[in-house]
UniProtKB/Swiss-Prot annotation:
It is an enzyme of class 1 (oxidoreductase). Coiled coil: none annotated. It comes from Methanocaldococcus jannaschii (strain ATCC 43067 / DSM 2661 / JAL-1 / JCM 10045 / NBRC 100440). This is Probable arogenate/prephenate dehydrogenase. The keyword Oxidoreductase applies. In the N-terminal section; belongs to the prephenate/arogenate dehydrogenase family. GO terms for biological process: tyrosine biosynthetic process. Residues 6-288 form the Prephenate/arogenate dehydrogenase domain. PROSITE patterns: PDH_ADH (PS51176). NCBIfam families: PRK08655.1-2, PRK08655.1-4.
Length: 446
């Protein structure tokens, strides 16, 4: 696709995943139009992303070579019926909702002859940095699979590093009924159960096994999302009803077995489930072990950094903070920044030390320096000394002097030592002079 020649209209592109695609595609050189009901928000997005905004869906559909419907699931069918008839012949209509049978049927029924339809489900959220290694599901009919537009979209996604899966919309909704529907239903039910039992989540974590920690984290992640989106996933997938009934029946059966103290019955169900999983049971154990290890090793790593210089990077905003890691309290780390304490949620930051810290300092901070003059005997090769010190400091020689006021048989070497703040330079100077003394030098003056 020649990006600069194509206009992509994103219906609902002022928020969520629609806005994500607006930014991503604009950065790839496409002309992008976004629509939304909130004019003030739309104008802000227009300015922020450098795209065109209109609150007229039909106008945007008429202009787009590619039209992407990116509205909430509960209004997707209505919006498709509104815009599909206005997509020009020879152009492409897509949607990016997480159900596929309803939008696929609506698009097929309401487009003109000669318009290609590619229902699409990106399996990621708007916090994802790029398409690299992300799953994107395409559900075109056979008619639209054998088109130039399909090849262009497929090849673009592959070129961007996405994992592209092509399946019929019916199969998609059956699979998503499990992958999203059952998963969300189970974890939201768990969260609601903990609420009904009035469980103090923070208190319970003090007694938690690693698996409980993982479960609580997953529940928290899911129930902290947009509840309307999750409601629509449950209510608009035609396959969900059967899945719910099966899940609830299994819960009732296991509950009855426990109530009757039927130990063998319980063992039978668990063994049969494990047999059904086959090798995936061991794979699940392996991945959960890795997740547990990651949780514990992260805390161990942070404990070893207490009292040391670190960089703390917010994984959402990418803002970087520098300071000394003072302590870890529950889910928070405490950073001493120039004498002031600041708390950061461990789950929302990355912590850097060593070489990674040095790279971040070079990128984000302005260098400062001190000059320190030391005396060495005349026959000492200052380049050898410098090469040794470079392994420990950001340092250079700015002067070598053997004239007046220099002790006989000695020469003065002035080093310029770099750092990023007064406290750091003070510590560096102390360490520097200690090393100088141990290799036969002595301080002259600063």
């Amino acid at each position: 696709m020649k990006n600069t020649n194509l206009t992509i209209s994103i219906i609902g592109g002022t928020d969520g995943l629609g806005k994500w695609f607006a930014r991503y595609l604009k950065n790839k050189g496409f002309n992008v139009i976004v629509t939304g009901r909130d004019i003030e928000k739309g104008k802000n997005v227009e300015k922020e992303l450098g795209v065109e905004f209109t609150n007229n869906n039909i106008e945007a559909a008429k202009k787009g070579d590619i039209v992407i419907v990116a509205v909430p699931i509960n209004v997707t069918e209505r919006v498709i019926k509104e815009v599909a008839p206005h997509v020009r012949e020879g152009c492409l209509l897509m949607d990016i909702t997480s159900i596929k049978e309803i939008p696929s049927k609506a698009m097929e029924e309401h487009v003109k002859e000669g318009v290609t339809v590619i229902p699409t489900h990106p399996m990621f959220g708007p916090s994802t940095p790029s398409l690299l290694r992300q799953v994107v599901i395409l559900t075109p009919s056979e008619k639209h699979k054998n088109t130039e537009w399909f090849n262009k979209v497929y090849n673009f996604l592959k070129k961007e590093g996405a994992k592209v899966i092509v399946i019929p919309p019916e199969k998609h909704d059956r699979i998503m009924g499990i992958v999203q529907g059952l998963t969300h239903f189970a974890f939201i039910s768990l969260g609601a159960t903990l609420k009904e039992l009035n469980v103090d989540i923070k208190e319970s974590r003090k007694f938690a096994s690693p698996i409980y920690e993982l479960m609580i984290s997953i529940i928290g992640r899911i129930i902290g999302q947009n509840p309307y989106l999750y409601a629509d996933i449950q209510m608009f997938n035609p396959r969900i009803k059967e899945i719910h009934e099966t899940f609830i029946n299994q819960c009732k059966e296991i509950s009855e077995i426990v109530k009757n103290k039927d130990r063998e019955g319980f063992v039978k169900i668990m063994k049969e489930a494990a047999k059904h999983f086959g090798s995936e049971a061991k794979r699940g154990a392996y991945y959960s072990d890795k997740a547990v290890f990651a949780l514990t090793s992260e805390i161990e790593k942070l404990n070893k950094l207490i009292g040391k210089d670190v960089a703390v990077k917010n994984i959402n905003s990418n803002v970087v903070h520098f300071g000394v890691l003072k302590d870890i309290e529950d889910d928070y780390l405490i950073l001493n920044k120039n004498g002031k304490e600041q708390k950061f949620n461990i789950l929302r930051v990355e912590v850097f030390a060593g070489d990674e810290l040095s790279k971040l300092k070079k990128k984000h901070l302005e260098k400062k320096y001190i000059d320190v003059s030391v005396l060495f005997k005349k026959d000492v090769d200052e380049e050898v000394i410098l090469n040794l010190l470079k392994k420990m400091f950001d340092i250079e020689i700015i002067d070598v002097y053997e004239g007046e006021k220099i002790e006989e048989g000695y020469k003065s070497i002035t080093f310029r030592i770099y750092g990023y703040n007064k406290d750091e330079l003070k510590n560096i100077e102390k360490e520097f002079l200690k090393i100088i003394k141990n290799i036969g030098g002595k301080e002259r003056f600063k």
